[in-house]
Amino acid sequence: MSFGRSLLDHAIRYRRFGSFAALGARRAAAGRTYRAHAMHELLRRRDPAGPGWADVAGFRLRYLEAEWMRYLYREVFAEREYWFATDNPRPVILDCGSNIGMAILFFKSLYPDAEIVAFEPAPWACEAIGETIRANALHGITVHNAALAEMEGSLELFHDPVHPGSAVMSVHRDRMQGEAIQVPAVRLSRYVTNPVDFLKLDVEGSELAVLRDLASSGAIGQIRQMVIEFHHHMSPGVDMLSECLSILEQHGFGYQLTAGQVYTPITRGQFQDVLVHAYRK
């Protein structure tokens, strides 16, 4: 059995198992097998520096840099940061901060008939997503080359021109000290007119702006589950995580938090990625 087929089989098995509480030993065993396959493939790869093509879970993926591709692969497939369960065979998914589309492939491996609306401000990353979609004849995917904000218009996107495949691009200079290009900015609430099964929000520092927009417009009421990558202390010493959690609590969400490694003794105000897994109570 090929790695891609094996990984896809495990992804389907995860979908069938259901919630974390009900999985028990079967899910734990499947999880260990899934991670073992994924990490084996991650370490085995010897891709060119990039750009290039990679085989991922039975799909062909267009990437811009091999190292960043492996980094995204580890987050999305090996660590399953965006795994979710739903009874809807055609879930509506918002992928905010798509980069090269690794999560799009993960969602399609879980739910082949999913309807995915993706947002990515970097035009070169959007081109890579388009190539991946065409190479795999994928359907049900709409890609918007735009940043997400509280107000529509345009924003500066800061990026590293030496590393076009980097996952660290932002409209906030505190997050990326690089060159700037102008990109269109839209409000996510415009695109939330019907129930959304899952929202992935990884927008490099704009997550509060998006949540405020969803809350003020009432669109947050349409969302059933979400994973938010909150960039804690992106501006050193500025504490805003409580606002994120408060918005969720006020709109009927419970949540679990996972955070990146903390080194001791801690450094006050140190940057930290915090994953917020939010679900309807």
Where are the model-predicted features located?
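Phosphate/nucleotide-binding beta-alpha loop and adjacent structural elements of enzyme active sites
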Residues: M1-K281
